Swiss-Prot record:
Location in the cell: Mitochondrion outer membrane
Membrane topology (Mitochondrial intermembrane): 53-61
Protein name in the entry: Mitochondrial import receptor subunit TOM6
Disulfide bond residue pairs: none
Species assigned in the record: Saccharomyces cerevisiae (strain ATCC 204508 / S288c)
Keywords: Acetylation, Membrane, Mitochondrion, Mitochondrion outer membrane, Protein transport, Transmembrane, Transmembrane helix, Transport
InterPro entries, per the entry: Tom6 (IPR020266)
One cellular component (GO) term of this entry: mitochondrial outer membrane
């Protein structure tokens, strides 16, 4: 029962010390990363919709 329901890496984590997280890894795990990523996607989408490229892709009805 021990191997089937154990968390992956639980046994190995106790024996070996954890490496300190880099600044980027700590930022990537923070909620600010999700907010910044979604904000960047939103800005890119608005810029694409407002661009002349969108006018060229849309059919002229």
């Amino acid at each position: 029962m021990d191997g089937m329901f154990a968390m992956p890496g639980a046994a190995a984590g106790a024996a070996s010390p954890q490496q300190p997280k880099s600044r980027f890894q700590a930022f990537k795990e923070s909620p600010l990363y999700t907010i910044a990523l979604n904000g960047a996607f939103f800005v890119a989408g608005v810029a694409f919709i407002q661009s002349p490229l969108m006018d060229m892709l849309a059919p002229q009805l």
